[in-house]
Design a protein with these regions (language model features):
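Bacterial N-terminal signal peptides
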Residues: 16-31
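N-terminal secretory signal peptides that target proteins for export/translocation
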Residues: 1-13
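Boundary regions of SH3-family modules and the immediately adjacent low-complexity/disordered segments
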Residues: 38-53, 87, 99-133, 141-143, ...
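Signal peptide processing junction and immediate N-terminal pro/mature segment
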Residues: 29-41
Length: 194
């Protein structure tokens, strides 16, 4: 799953009771990070020293998405929306390989990206050229029982203020409220954003 890490245990099967007792004793000496415990792997850091993958947003209204990490590579696509969230999936020197909400990947110069967190609401529900879009409810608190502030169409861009892993507080077109985190593309499942 994107953005989450598998936690598991390495199962140890000591050959004798003595070996089992030594293992327990060794665990007591070295603490919970002993031989059998295997925690979640640390996120990989890219050339920038920042975690990969991670969400960022576009700084400019015109950002070239290139087929490779350099200006000598052809432009495959031009993003035309500042603030659009993209996921950094790889880094090479000053270039970042990114993926957008539709799954398109390519390379962008790192200076064209911002750490500002944004999200697209229900991008998988956008129906191009068809009438009414799917709606998400923006609420006045982080609960399904909270009153509605606004209804927001699929594909709308939101600014993320905070996320607690279940709900995100966002601003959309002059409205502020809470939306369920799984309805956003731009924040990982269970990710906390402060």
């Amino acid at each position: 799953m994107r953005g989450s890490f598998h936690k598991g245990l390495v199962h140890c099967q000591p050959r004798t009771v003595t070996a089992a007792l030594l293992l327990v004793f060794a665990q007591a000496l070295v603490g919970p990070t002993g031989l059998c415990a295997q925690g979640a792997p640390a996120p990989a850091n890219g050339a920038s020293g920042l975690p990969v993958p991670r969400f960022v947003s576009l700084k400019s209204d015109r950002v070239n998405l290139r087929q490779g990490p350099g200006t000598e590579y052809p432009t495959a696509w031009v993003f035309r929306r500042a603030g659009l969230p993209v996921e950094v999936i790889k880094e090479f020197e000053s270039w970042r390989q990114v993926r957008d909400a539709e799954g398109t990947t390519g390379w962008v110069l790192g200076s064209m990206l911002s750490g500002r967190r944004t999200a697209v609401i229900l991008p998988w529900e956008v129906k191009a050229g068809q009438g009414q879009q799917a709606l998400a409810v923006l609420r006045d608190d982080d609960s399904e029982r909270a009153g509605p502030v606004a209804q927001v169409e699929a594909g709308v861009l939101a600014n993320i203020i905070t996320c607690d892993g279940k709900w995100c507080r966002v601003s959309v077109g002059g409205f502020r409220g809470y939306i369920e985190q799984p309805k956003l593309w731009g924040a990982y499942k269970d990710e906390v954003i402060k």
